[in-house]
Amino acid sequence: IDTKKFQSVFDYLMDWYLHQNVKFVIPIRELGRKRIFNVDEIKYFETYYNDLEIVTIDDQHFMAHVKNRYKLRPVLKSRWFMQVNQSVLVNMKCIDFLTDRNVILKSREVFPTSRKTLFQNHLLFEKFLKEQEEKELLKNGESKN
């Protein structure tokens, strides 16, 4: 099958996907530390290629991709997961879309290749952290009075 025929359709889908669902890219280690934000609940879904993680932060639901290091086929590793050090947080609405095996692979191919997207997402994540810090300061300020 010549996949180039579908490239425009796929570009359109990915544009929609990024606009609708991606909140920001968050480094897995930050999520692991649970530094500032309260993680109310974490649920894991294991799929053939990835672990999907439902994360609840301040009553908002996000979904993270966590690279499945154990079950990943070596052949796919370099091709699909090349620069992925991040897990991608998206709306939970997208769960059905993401649990489709092929869509996971295709979407993972697109995210890391766009450096611009990574930078934009990184800035959004920084902004998110600042907002959380400000919330904490306000909470602490109120409790002291």
Spans of model-derived segments:
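Conserved binding/recognition cores within well-folded domains
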Residues: 7-106, 112
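Eukaryotic intrinsically disordered, low-complexity regulatory linkers and tails enriched in Ser/Thr/Pro
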Residues: 1-34, 75, 117-145
